[in-house]
Amino acid sequence: MYEYLHGLITAVYPDHVVVDVNGVGYLVNTANPYRYEVSATAVTIYVYQAVSDTAQTLYGFSDFAEKQLFLKLINVNGIGPKSALAILANPDHQGLMMAIKTNDTGFLTKFPGVGKKTAGQIVLDLQNKLDDLAPATDDNTLFTPEVAPTTTENPQLADALAALTALGYRETAVKKITAQLRQFNGQTTNDYLSEGLRLLTK
């Protein structure tokens, strides 16, 4: 079982990154792949390895606190790794924990794959189990901002929309916020993705 990987990001996709560790490329599913960039500088990604009869899957996190929150979420009945990643994609982890503590199921049902029953289960299982967990933060120190192109075809926006779909948000919901995102003055894919998540969960 792996605790973390330390290596080079060699590729970034809407739902995962590839981490090269001593010449071996690891496919790591992350809540926000565009937090990272292809770089010659090594990064550390905390990981959780899920093993099934058909596959071994790695899930990656920006810090230990985010990993701990993920582990708590997947222990809730009805929440799998993919749903947990979709929840963690919203960078406001402190707001997430506050929603759980205050029984704000309306906030929780805004995440893909979380209905009223599952939201209630999250509150029931975790309401009194988060006090020992420091809020995970959206660490952007590993990401170097890029200047968004001025053409109508914005690759950063396109990548962010693809990432939202990969997280499980319905295509109709993503389309509804696309016009607002086009008006958003984002610099990077991470900017557009964070704003998209804010719009989808407000």
UniProtKB/Swiss-Prot annotation:
InterPro entries: DNA_helicase_Holl-junc_RuvA_I, Hlx-hairpin-Hlx_DNA-bd_motif, NA-bd_OB-fold, RuvA, RuvA_2-like, RuvA_C, RuvA_C_sf. Residues 142-151 are annotated as: Flexible linker. It holds the Pfam family HHH_5. GO terms for biological process: DNA recombination; DNA repair. One of its GO terms (molecular function) is four-way junction DNA binding. It is found in: Cytoplasm. Disulfide bonds: none annotated. Residues 152-202 are annotated as: Domain III. Residues 1-62 are annotated as: Domain I. Keywords: Cytoplasm, DNA damage, DNA recombination, DNA repair, DNA-binding. One of its GO terms (cellular component) is Holliday junction resolvase complex. Residues 63-141 are annotated as: Domain II. Belongs to the RuvA family. Has three domains with a flexible linker between the domains II and III and assumes an 'L' shape. Domain III is highly mobile and contacts RuvB. Homotetramer. Forms an RuvA(8)-RuvB(12)-Holliday junction (HJ) complex. HJ DNA is sandwiched between 2 RuvA tetramers; dsDNA enters through RuvA and exits via RuvB. An RuvB hexamer assembles on each DNA strand where it exits the tetramer. Each RuvB hexamer is contacted by two RuvA subunits (via domain III) on 2 adjacent RuvB subunits; this complex drives branch migration. In the full resolvosome a probable DNA-RuvA(4)-RuvB(12)-RuvC(2) complex forms which resolves the HJ. The RuvA-RuvB-RuvC complex processes Holliday junction (HJ) DNA during genetic recombination and DNA repair, while the RuvA-RuvB complex plays an important role in the rescue of blocked DNA replication forks via replication fork reversal (RFR). RuvA specifically binds to HJ cruciform DNA, conferring on it an open structure. The RuvB hexamer acts as an ATP-dependent pump, pulling dsDNA into and through the RuvAB complex. HJ branch migration allows RuvC to scan DNA until it finds its consensus sequence, where it cleaves and resolves the cruciform DNA. This is Holliday junction branch migration complex subunit RuvA. It comes from Levilactobacillus brevis (strain ATCC 367 / BCRC 12310 / CIP 105137 / JCM 1170 / LMG 11437 / NCIMB 947 / NCTC 947).
